[in-house]
């Protein structure tokens, strides 16, 4: 069990607007990049291959292919440096860590997509 004083201090630094996503989801992370005195937002889009827990130390790893080369980036979940995390599609995977995607190429490296239920026409017209 962690010390209550440490938990109280850490709670101040946790983000309240964290997007819910899981391993296998396709996400777009809008990350603030500081270049000199200017600050701009850079988007990084890929598949979440790992999530770690740990209050303010929680991280997630996103993998994408850029010009045929695999690029992975680790993001702190509670960092003030990102603007938002967009979930583009939900992935249907049976594992917590998808490191096996590193060895796969082409169509084999795809993750099955969960189809989100669309509202029926009757329900849409009734409201």
Swiss-Prot record:
Q: Name one GO molecular function term.
A: structural constituent of ribosome
- InterPro entries from the xrefs? Ribosomal_bL19, Ribosomal_bL19_CS, Ribosomal_bL19_sf, Translation_prot_SH3-like_sf
Superkingdom, according to UniProt?
Bacteria
GO terms, biological process: translation
Q: Does the keyword GTP-binding apply?
A: no
Pfam families attached here? Ribosomal_L19
Q: What does this protein do?
A: This protein is located at the 30S-50S ribosomal subunit interface and may play a role in the structure and function of the aminoacyl-tRNA binding site.
Family to which the UniProt record says this protein belongs? Belongs to the bacterial ribosomal protein bL19 family.
In Swiss-Prot or TrEMBL terms, this protein is called Large ribosomal subunit protein bL19
Native species of this protein?
Myxococcus xanthus (strain DK1622)
Gene behind the chain: rplS
């Amino acid at each position: 069990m962690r010390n209550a004083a440490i938990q109280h201090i850490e709670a101040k630094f946790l983000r309240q607007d964290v997007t819910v996503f899981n391993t296998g989801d396709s996400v777009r992370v809008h990350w603030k990049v500081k270049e000199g005195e200017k600050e701009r937002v850079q988007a990084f889009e890929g598949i979440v291959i790992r999530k770690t827990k740990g209050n303010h130390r929680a991280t997630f790893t996103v993998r994408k292919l850029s010009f045929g080369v695999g690029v992975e980036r680790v993001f702190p979940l509670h960092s003030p440096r990102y603007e938002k995390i967009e979930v583009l599609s939900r992935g249907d995977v049976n594992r917590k860590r998808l490191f096996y995607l590193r060895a796969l190429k082409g169509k084999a490296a795809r993750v099955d997509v969960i189809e989100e239920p669309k509202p029926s026409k009757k329900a849409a017209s009734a409201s």
